[in-house]
């Protein structure tokens, strides 16, 4: 005779919970990325910390390591992050500024060093004068007596014959012409003073130079009215 198996009733454990019952699913809170929700969550977190100050952990205690119990020595706590300086933030002074400040300090403490330092004076270079031989001077004088000015080919030919440079020949002719003109001018003035009718003993006065009389004598035929205006007259008139 067949027995029908009776269905077993589920065993209920203490607390009214069945072992075959599915474990309760924990509701997971979804994270909202809205600005209002983010600000509200942040305000709630700050409010919770501020409401229980006595239960808030000390960050310095958490960060500080515990002393070594075996050796009895503790490790010094590190500096807070706010006190640390990165190499990039450390102000470094340029080396050139340091040298400049050191130089200024030396000058302030020793002002007499600059005055006692020897000053090198650069003397102007003297222009060397060309020394002509007696034969060269005779040939130059002979050429100058015939021709006061030389062209470029003539100057080059004369310099080659006398073993001189063209610049030396050119400068010698320039100086020779200047001396000739000055000598001629002084001779003309001497002749004019000798032949002048105003060359009387009364004219030999320091207040009336002879050069002014010569200029008056030469300009009188052209400007006779100057003597009628009374602006100037010799001392013997």
Curated annotation (Swiss-Prot):
InterPro entries: HD, HD_metazoa, Homeobox_CS, Homeobox_NK-like, Homeodomain-like_sf
CDD domains xref list: homeodomain
A Gene Ontology BP annotation from the UniProt entry: negative regulation of insulin-like growth factor receptor signaling pathway
Bias (Basic and acidic residues) ranges: 1-14, 38-47, 57-71
Predominant location: nucleus
Induction cue: By androgens. During embryonic development, induced and maintained by sonic hedgehog in pre-somitic mesoderm, in immature somites and in urogenital sinus, but not in the other expression domains.
Tissue-level expression: Expressed mostly in the male urogenital tract, with highest expression in the epithelial cells lining the ducts of anterior, dorsolateral and ventral prostate and in the bulbourethral gland, and much lower in the seminal vesicle and the testis. Expression in the prostate increases during sexual maturation and is drastically reduced following castration. Expressed also in brain (hippocampus and external granular layer of the cerebral cortex), kidney (intralobular arteries), thymus and adrenal and salivary glands.
One Pfam assignment: Homeodomain
GO molecular function: cysteine-type endopeptidase activator activity involved in apoptotic process; DNA binding; DNA-binding transcription factor activity; DNA-binding transcription factor activity, RNA polymerase II-specific; DNA-binding transcription factor binding; histone deacetylase binding; MADS box domain binding; nuclear estrogen receptor binding
Biased composition (Polar residues): 24-34
Transmembrane regions listed in the UniProt entry: none
One GO location term (cellular component): cytosol
UniProt PTM comment: Ubiquitinated by TOPORS; monoubiquitinated at several residues and also polyubiquitinated on single residues.
DNA-binding region positions on the chain: 125-184
Keywords linked to the UniProt accession: Developmental protein, DNA-binding, Homeobox, Nucleus, Repressor, Transcription, Transcription regulation, Tumor suppressor, Ubl conjugation
Subcellular locations according to the entry: Nucleus
Phenotype of null mutants: Defects in prostate ductal morphogenesis and secretory protein production. The bulbourethral gland displays prostatic epithelial hyperplasia, which increases in severity with age. Mice also display morphogenetic defects of minor salivary glands, which are reduced in size and exhibit severely altered duct morphology.
Region (Disordered): 1-96, 108-130
The protein's role, per its UniProt record: Transcription factor, which binds preferentially the consensus sequence 5'-TAAGT[AG]-3' and can behave as a transcriptional repressor. Plays an important role in normal prostate development, regulating proliferation of glandular epithelium and in the formation of ducts in prostate. Acts as a tumor suppressor controlling prostate carcinogenesis, as shown by the ability to suppress growth and tumorigenicity of prostate carcinoma cells. Plays a role in the formation of minor salivary glands (particularly palatine and lingual glands).
Subunit structure: Interacts with serum response factor (SRF). Interacts with SPDEF. Interacts with WDR77. Interacts with TOPORS which polyubiquitinates NKX3-1 and induces its proteasomal degradation. Interacts with FEM1B.
Entry's family note: Belongs to the NK-3 homeobox family.
Name the UniProt record assigns to this protein: Homeobox protein Nkx-3.1
Taxonomic path: Eukaryota, Metazoa, Chordata, Craniata, Vertebrata
